[in-house]
Amino acid sequence: NAAILYIWVTPEESRRKNADRADPNGPGSNLHHGVPLAVMLGEYGCDDMEYLVNTSGQKGTVTVKAHGNTYHVPIGIFDNRVDKTSFLRAEPSAWDAALVEDVTCAIRQATDTMWAGYRK
């Protein structure tokens, strides 16, 4: 069993976030890691998830053909093309309640969609 929670960010926004979050003094940190630009361009330079969703054999899924079988993996999409998450790197005491509500609702919508497809 599987499901996909996809965080939708444009490649340009992904590179911007990568540069903003990278801390050269803590490169092993989960919250402040950075990926070299060559890797960002070579491995994350395009986004094919929209194509995979739009060409899937079943709505709300990504079709995967493997080992002689066809799987329809449910997907929930958290649209973060307009940044909803960067504020979360600050101390929680500094978080704006309206921003917390916005990101919470957006993630809940994506996970509810994903879970509904998973339970079918």
Predicted regions and their residues:
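Substrate-engagement module of ASCE P-loop NTPases
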Residues: N1
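Conserved GTP-binding G-domain of TRAFAC-class P-loop NTPases and closely related GTPase folds
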Residues: I4-K120
